[in-house]
Amino acid sequence: VGSEMCIRDRPFIVANHPAAALLLKTGALGLSASQAIAASVSAPDWTQLWVPTPHPSIILLYYILLFSIATQPIISRPLLLKIVGLAAAVGMLLHPFRLSILLGQPPTTVTILNVGHGSANLVEFTNGRVVLIDGGARSAPGYDCGERIIAPYLWHRGIGKIDDIIITHDDTDHYNGIFTLLTRFKPERLWLPHLDENKPAFTRLVDRARRQGITIITPAAGEIIAGDDEQMSVLGDHRAAGLTSEDDRGLVVRLTSGGKSVLFPGDITTRRELELVAVRTQVRSTILLSPHHGSATSNSPALLSAVSPEWLIISSGTS
């Protein structure tokens, strides 16, 4: 059955035949198979490689080495070029930027990243261990602070792997950037205050970590996360039966190193603050990350007096 049309005064026959539908469906099978093959090939981790940004001087040494290799056939003194190339190669291997990692003993550094209203704190220990405490931000849908802020900073620092990620609290502004970091930095351990199956996004994060073989740890009160000369420990009992607020059931982490200390209290409220002070928990710290992003329901005078910080940092955006 057909119908006749006229295009630019010329007759044109449009066929409506069962064979046409069969041909279209046959072609669609090929397209679907191609899409499935492309998806399966691109899915594994080995199809993409994420690396930290090399130091500018390493890039310079690389080009010197490349130049020495490429110009040997046309230079009258190839021995000199070989020496220059060898020196460049040795310089790349023993670059001060790499020596600080190989020899150890750089000072422990703590970086509070500006993610707006959220929390992302990087700790680099003297032994090379890298710990991220929280990694999230209150942001528009589709914006990933892990991909846009945290990962670029880590690459800028020359960090290609995170050893531990600690999530102090299961609000999204503490962890929604960590999905990306699990894939790109492959941490060995993920520390959580608890496993809350009532929060789908949080559950998806935990499930992804398990699929990647990451060890899931829910630490007890007083548990030591890092030891030796530097110590990172969990303060207070975040599992106490009387704690009904989700904010108060988060982790409070204290880092001490070289006579200095930093307190990461998550989103705890005044009630949990007073309990920490009442049992004489060692909370005195050089730096205090303001509880709950500086909220009026936290930051009690009792806690501020007990911590007595030299610096108070509020990780919050404009409202």
What are these model-predicted stretches?
Residues 4, 9-319:
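Non-globular, low-confidence helical/coil segments that flank catalytic cores
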